Amino acid sequence: MKNIQLNNGVQMPLLGYGVYQVDPKECERCVSDAISVGYRMIDTAQIYRNEEGVGNAIKKSGIDRKEFFIVTKVWVSNAGYEKAKASIETSLRKLQTDYIDLLLVHQPFGDYYGSYRAMEEAYKEGKVRAIGVSNFYADRYLDLAYHCEIKPAVNQMETHVFYQQQDLQELMKKYDTKLMSWGPFAEGKNDFFANPTLNAIGEKYHKSAAQVALRYLLQRDIICIPKSVRKERMQQNFNVFDFQLSAEDMSQIATLDTQQTLFFSHRDPAFVEMILQYGR
């Protein structure tokens, strides 16, 4: 597994397993399957309501905790210094661990400055190894990075071949913040898996469109957390380190970028309203 070095020196796997929308009742089994495939980085969140399943699977694996890299996120309903501080303790308990490897502000809403202060404090206390943000567009990212003491190590954003975040990735180099992709397969939108460019390139390497798409992001040093509840798909997603895309391949895939979200805008009032109500 290839690692990437964060801005505080912490080594983070480039590829992990995401549990967004994994049923809490199924999560332990799914994470156990992912661990057996070889995944050691697991991405969860307070709002996913499956942190317990992640913690159970890691505990039961019998593998040393130090071998794992656990990511979780502080939800909007826990925004603010006091609430975020309490929620971090809850996450530690649910995950059955003394520390979280990477803790993110999940959404740029509510008192996320207060949340971030609580995260900085947890970092200094050794309860968190690295901190960052999620879904922070360039303006909100820059504002937070400029004013905070500990610069975000990671910004997790919608990132896939149709929305490549080239400009944001370049901008974040100012504070050495790494880009982390959610939705690396765009949840199949735009006929993702039937894309002619991805499939034509895949034929050269005997790889699927999904594997080519993942490899493209990984070669750009973008951290990826593909999700599947099927073990065979977990294995396919994991088998992306035995081939290298050429410069021509990379250029071809770059032309697929629409620079537009395929999901939602964090500046859409209706979406913001929904996020603010969700999980309250």
Where are these regions (language model features)?
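Beta/alpha (TIM)-barrel catalytic core signal, keyed to glycine-rich beta->alpha loops juxtaposed to Asp/Glu
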Residues: 107-280
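N-terminal binding-site loop/beta-alpha segment at the start of enzyme catalytic domains
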Residues: 1-68, 185, 278-280
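Acidic (Asp/Glu)-rich catalytic clusters
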Residues: 7, 55-65, 89-96, 121-123, ...
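Alpha-helical scaffolding within the catalytic cores
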Residues: 1-4, 52-59, 88-90, 138-141, ...
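Acidic-and-aromatic substrate-binding clefts and catalytic sites of carbohydrate-active enzymes
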Residues: 22-25, 45-53, 77-82, 108-113, ...
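Glycine/small-residue-rich loop that forms an oxyanion/phosphate-binding "nest" at active or ligand-binding sites
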Residues: 73-121
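Residues at the N-termini of beta-strands
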Residues: 41, 99-102, 130, 154
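Short, acidic/polar
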Residues: 22-34, 79-95, 114, 139-142, ...
